[in-house]
Structure formats: structure tokens, C-alpha cells
Amino acid sequence: MLFHRILPQYKTAISTYLTPTHCRLYIANLVTSRRMTNIEAAKKLAAYRAVDENLPPHAKVIGIGSGSTVVYVAERIGQLPNKDDFVCISTGFQSKQLIIDNGLKLGQIEQHPSIDIAFDGADEVDPQLNLIKGGGACLFQEKLVASASDKLIIVADFRKQSKHLGQNWRQGVPIEVVPIAFTKLINDLKRLGAKSVDLRQGGKAKAGPVITDNNNFILDADFGIIEDPKSLHLQLKQLVGVVDTGLFTGITEKVYFGEESGEVTTWDGVVTGSTTEEVIAESK
């Protein structure tokens, strides 16, 4: 029934060459494709709104993070008529390329330690605007830029929303570590309650572990549901060999989500105890 409704003009031709199983697979792929198109459109809208509503008119230094939604942030900033009036600070290789590709001026944080505003993505966000970041192995530079910024704005899609950190993001908390300390740190993290700790590997693109832009390793530590992200971050930072963690707490001002429906949801911090559903309802 769905097949005949969606593709009436192709019904005879496709039915001639495809079995019922192939038809169902074709329709499933078509629906998935349309869903992803809606998500991408919403991500773009969220990014554009984030820039339009938050970028100071006389900003001189802007931080640009990484992630699939931040691509649209850089695109929007690159459309500004005054883009020659400011410099952009990257958080890693990907964001550096985004800055260059969109005709923006690239600056260095060593020369511009005070940043007017930063835009970045996230792997998971809870209603208190705590974040898990570091899926792209840029967490230290992302946190450095965020901490130097007067305002941090996060853009992401709805799949990054979560009632608690660790609920939807199952890969663990990314932790950047000094290479010589990684073996000891695996044991230390397990003693702190990590269910598992993995040294992140380069996969097909690289034999061996991922090397960050700072020549460090990434450990992914699964602590399950994280009830107190700030406390966990502070405990992890006390371990010798830890450079920084992917837990970002008390630093985000607002989050823009592209929804599956094509709409944009914004979170700007709520009273502790509110549920994700309540936050979404309040923000629409």
C-alpha cells in the first residue's frame, strides 16, 4: 500500500523488475533518505538561527568548533558582509578547514586569547546543558576555546538530547591522556567506576591508536549514566596523565537542536530535575 502511494508513477515499471522484497527495501531506503534530508535541513536551520541570534554585531574574535552541524555555522558566518572584520579560532583540523573553505580569516588562540563567542557541536546534551564532547578527538582544544569565550553556543541535532549524560552516548567519556600514562590510567579509571576503558583506535584509516592534534591518546571510559558530571570531571582531572575530559559543565549558554520534524528547539538551562520532555515542551 505504501509502495503504491509513494511512487504511483513508477508502479508498473518498478513492479516489473523488482520482487516484493526489493520493493519494500526500496521504500524503506526512500523513507530513510527523506528523514535524513529533513534532519539535515533542520541542522542547517538551527545553525543559521544560532549565528543570527547570538553573534555580536561587532565581534572581533569568533571560535569555530567541529561537528556536522557546525559545518552550517561556518557557512552562515562566511556569508556575512563584514567577515573581514573578525578572525576565527579553530578547535582542530576540521574546523580550521571549515574556516578556510568559507573564506574566513584564521587566527591563533595564542594571539587572540579572549574570544567574543564560540560555536561548537556536542555528542550529548542534558537539560542542565552539561555536554559530552570529544567524539572527534578534539576535546582539549574545544575546551580551551570554550573557556576563553564570553559565550558558548552549541548546535546539534535532536539525537544528541538526553535526560542524563551517558544515556544515549554509549561510547564512553572521551579523555585525552599523555601517551606514556595510558596503561596506568586504564586501571585508575576502572577503580573510579568505569565499566570499560578503551584506547581509541584509528580504524581503517590508521593502524594503531588515534593521535590528537596535541600528540596525545584518547581513552573512552564508560561510566554508564552520569548523575553528577561536574564531580566526575573533577575526579578525572586529578589523575596524573589526564590532559582533559570530554565533560563540559557550567560553560554552555544555549543549545540549538535541529528536530526530525524540521523545526528548531532551543535549550537555555532549566531547574535541576526537569525532564528532557519538559525542556522540549517549554522551548517550543
Swiss-Prot record:
EC number(s) on file: 5.3.1.6
One Gene Ontology cellular component annotation held by this UniProt entry: cytoplasm
UniProt pathway annotation: Carbohydrate degradation; pentose phosphate pathway; D-ribose 5-phosphate from D-ribulose 5-phosphate (non-oxidative stage): step 1/1
Main localisation: cytoplasm
Sample GO molecular function, one term: ribose-5-phosphate isomerase activity
GO BP terms: D-ribose metabolic process; pentose-phosphate shunt, non-oxidative branch; pyridoxine biosynthetic process
Annotated keywords: Cytoplasm, Isomerase
Protein name: Ribose-5-phosphate isomerase
Species name: Lodderomyces elongisporus (strain ATCC 11503 / CBS 2605 / JCM 1781 / NBRC 1676 / NRRL YB-4239)
Gene: RKI1
